[in-house]
Regions:
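Surface-exposed, low-hydrophobicity beta-strand/loop segments enriched in small/polar/acidic residues
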Residues: 1-121
């Protein structure tokens, strides 16, 4: 879930979100772009989410999309299929804005879901 507040920008300033898998922490040249499903919320005063849309990146215009949230859902099986050695998922946020605040948090699912995890003991 990515949230942002009021942005100081003009009509051309954007936030672009990508999800990349990698064998190294942080974005690298060997990172693989992941396809994800996203939903963009209405402004904070609204109670409406946009339709679920599949993409490898999503760009929002800062001036038209102040104080919104973006839900990004990545299928763990797709990450494994694209890059079996991936240890990291990076949320890449490219911004062309003068000023603003962005926060993100993640709920991580197991790569191999099971009812009881095996231990080494």
């Amino acid at each position: 879930l990515v949230n942002w507040g009021d942005m100081t920008s003009d009509s051309t300033d954007t936030l672009t979100f990508r999800v990349e898998s990698s064998t190294a922490a942080g974005s690298t040249t060997s990172a693989i772009a992941q396809t994800f499903t996203y939903r963009l919320a209405a402004a904070i005063t609204g109670d409406n989410w946009g339709d679920a849309t599949s993409a490898s990146s999503v760009a929002v215009t800062a001036a038209a999309n102040d104080s919104m949230a973006l839900v990004i859902d990545v299928d763990p099986a797709a990450v494994t299929a694209a890059d079996t050695d991936a240890k990291y998922l990076n949320l890449a946020i490219d911004s062309v804005i003068e000023a603003g605040y962005v926060s993100a948090w993640a709920l991580i699912e197991d790569r191999y879901p099971q009812s009881e995890h095996l231990t080494s003991t």
